[in-house]
């Protein structure tokens, strides 16, 4: 294997992918995530991370991209949600990671397009996980709706992890 950049970050991302699967935070229907590793560098999980790999990834599986979504390292294909990850990671300087997933315990809310209320003191400061307007999956319109949701909560998003529900699809969360 040739030398790859950001090896420690990639190894950490392998653990996150494994945890996502093992803890039922996503399923074979999909899921993907990205981490900003430098000013104009983002590591992102490849397309079909869940469907083909069941989230068992190797460090070299992650793609290194720039803010134009050019693949700088890696041989895989970008996820259909790649633009959404890039949009949030480039427009919010305090957000360093984004995850799109299909968590088992959230999918009831997703299927009904219902917000997830706060139930613990620890989550009160973030507000509920609300729904964005229904938008067809894998489209720029969906990604723009997600960005609008974050923009409307900019101060909160720059301070705390937040998330939203994409009706009939899944969830998106961000954090530092």
Protein language model annotation of sequence segments:
Residues 1-176:
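Glycine-rich flexible loops
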